[in-house]
Amino acid sequence: HPAGLFWLHPHLHGSVARQVALGLAAPLIIRGGLDAVPDVSAAREHVLVLQDFELDRLGRPIDPGMGALMGGREGTLVTVSGQTQPRYAIEQDGLLRLRLLNASASRFYRLSLEGHSMHIIATDGGSLAVPQQVDELLLAPGERRDVLILGSRAGGVFRLMNLPYNRGSAGMMGGTLGSRTAFEIASVVYEGRAASPRQVPQ
């Protein structure tokens, strides 16, 4: 099996979107390929499973109805691997590898890290021959990306932002779909300096 980040989710006909919207999804990592590249293997690695939920007043997930699923419901609570706004450590002159999975049923994520570029090294189609440097990336439901972040700053805390994204019209249901405001989903904090300076492999 090819190496990379994959994911598990239900395949019960007629119930997939509902179960994914309620959080039934998990990452699956197959090792190999890029994992043997020295700078990649030396990077601090985290898997970020992005999900959104709608909760009732007691904090319980609301079971989405057919109308909400057809309308592309976006939950008001966004979690990252089950946490809200987690922090990830990066070393100065080190590398951070974020393995991103959009496990939301409808929400698109348009991600940007303050003060840093991201270097895409793999997609859900496999590893890239040459890393692609971007200032933001878009993840549709089910999409995956592996990115490297170089610890190029002297220190500080930098927010991983989800930027507004217009998914288009809801058709006969009216309205515009997608996030209209930017918000923080996680942050990167500098802790120490790498014993050996790292570079994004080319």
Where are these regions (language model features)?
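Terminal connector regions
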Residues: 14-17, 153-191
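Histidine-centered copper-binding motifs that mark active-site loops
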Residues: 1-148, 187-202
